[in-house]
Amino acid sequence: VLTFAQLSDLHLDNGPRATARARQVVDYLRPLAGELDAVLVTGDLADHGLAEEYKELADLLDLPCPVLMTPGNHDDRAVYRQVLLGQAASQEPINSVHDIGGVRFALCDSSIPGRDDGWLADETLAWLDSVLGDGPSFVCFHHPPVLLHSWVDGIRQFGAERLEAVIARHPGVVAVLCGHAHTAGATTFAGRPLVVCPGVVSTLVLPVEDKREHAPGLALHVLDDERRLTTFYRTVV
């Protein structure tokens, strides 16, 4: 059994509101972190892609378990690489693969520098195809590749049929995990569950809902030995 948390859309800006909400969620997670197999963070880590924002993030997410991160549309690839990865500045996609407890996490960079919508570059899709094996795996990125019937649909991940073709070749893919929508959600993509993580900095509501403030949220995922994924959503007040 693999148990891990997912956070998304922290939008840290060195301001009091974003910091306080992120700290609420991390303070909730910290006592659990010794029992968690990982913490996954699916993009929009920083609000402006500044070095000081990533430094705040690194301090905040200093946890006793692996922390896996992938960029979103508010992140800056060059600064992200320098501060979080200790690499030379580059605008190439930031893709990474992590094996935890016999499960593979393929983290894909769906961001497009200077834009809010998403797209997986051809090189990213080729990389993804090469790292997905026969064992259980998660495909993770920021932008959802499907319509969610909210205003983020206009800035979703486009070219989804290309990704669908890759996933179709790999039956070991358990689920697709993403963020960007600032709300908890679940649907399907390529015949697999697609799980959307709630936002930390804010919650975006459907047109039929009242536009009021919501508490920050996170997802807790449990993958059992039969490769069944169960997701629990938590709000932190």
Please describe what each predicted stretch is.
Residues L7, R17-R23, V166, G185-V237:
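Binuclear metal-dependent phosphoesterase catalytic core
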Residues G135-V174, A181, V205:
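Active-site-proximal segments of metal-dependent phosphoesterases and phosphodiesterases across multiple
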